[in-house]
């Protein structure tokens, strides 16, 4: 009865189907422990060659589209802890802001998730990729930048943690958007955008 009840609760959580697909994949071939888990929203989910790009680091892509920091925290056991990673790389928060969360609320959600990760994975490195600025979400840029700044300041005070400023790297010399980096929706990235991400993220990844 307990197992049935727990399953029913899980099925009522947002993104159950996406998480279940990951679990089905793992049942066929479970990733080795001590890898690097990438968790977050669609910018990771749509990075289809992420695991191949970072193959030598034993990367595990657990991005699920449309997710917020609260969702990542809700599924922390199934999408992060189960893999016993040596490092966790987070890209999340953008959807929180787009859904109406303030910079302070987004920051608080990040701290909750970070604290949960740290409590369960005391030796793991935790790395946060800053929220990007995209043309389709220009109205949220101030909130995103404030949340990014708060997260950066927080992580500078934490041990074994990093902040990667991806937002600035995706702007032109005048601080404007670079539409050529984005798909037609002006939100999700083309390969050129992911090339920037690869260049900026790689130095922060830990080898075994």
Give the ranges of each region predicted by the language model:
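N-terminal secretory targeting modules
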Residues: 1-37, 44, 48, 52, ...
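Catalytic His-Asp segment of secreted/periplasmic serine-dependent ester chemistry enzymes
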Residues: 2, 135-208
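Conserved beta-strand elements of the Class I
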Residues: 37-39, 60
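Oxyanion-hole/transition-state-stabilizing segment in secreted/luminal serine hydrolases
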Residues: 44-60, 69-107, 127, 131-135
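Extracellular glycan-modifying ectodomains
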Residues: 95, 111, 115-116, 120, ...
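Charged helix-capping and loop-helix junction motifs
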Residues: 104-113, 143-148
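A short helix->loop->beta-strand "cap" motif at the edges of active sites that frequently abuts
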Residues: 121-125
């Amino acid at each position: 009865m307990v197992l049935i009840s727990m399953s029913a609760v899980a099925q009522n959580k947002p993104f159950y189907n996406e998480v279940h697909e990951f679990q089905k994949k793992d049942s066929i071939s479970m990733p080795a422990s001590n890898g690097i888990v990438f968790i977050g929203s669609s910018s990771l989910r749509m990075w289809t060659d992420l695991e191949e790009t970072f193959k030598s680091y034993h990367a595990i892509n657990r991005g699920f589209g449309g997710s917020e920091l609260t969702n990542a925290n809700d599924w922390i056991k199934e999408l992060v802890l189960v893999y016993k990673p040596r490092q966790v790389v987070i890209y999340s928060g953008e959807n929180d802001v787009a859904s109406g969360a303030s910079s302070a609320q987004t920051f608080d959600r990040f701290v909750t998730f970070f604290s949960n990760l740290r409590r369960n994975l005391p030796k793991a490195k935790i790395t946060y990729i800053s929220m990007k600025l995209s043309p389709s979400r220009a109205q949220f840029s101030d909130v995103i930048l404030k949340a990014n700044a708060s997260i950066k300041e927080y992580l500078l005070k934490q041990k074994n943690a990093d902040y990667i400023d991806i937002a600035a790297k995706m702007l032109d010399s005048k601080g404007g958007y670079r539409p050529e980096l984005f798909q037609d929706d002006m939100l999700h990235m083309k390969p050129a955008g992911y090339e920037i991400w690869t260049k900026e993220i790689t130095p922060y990844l830990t080898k075994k």
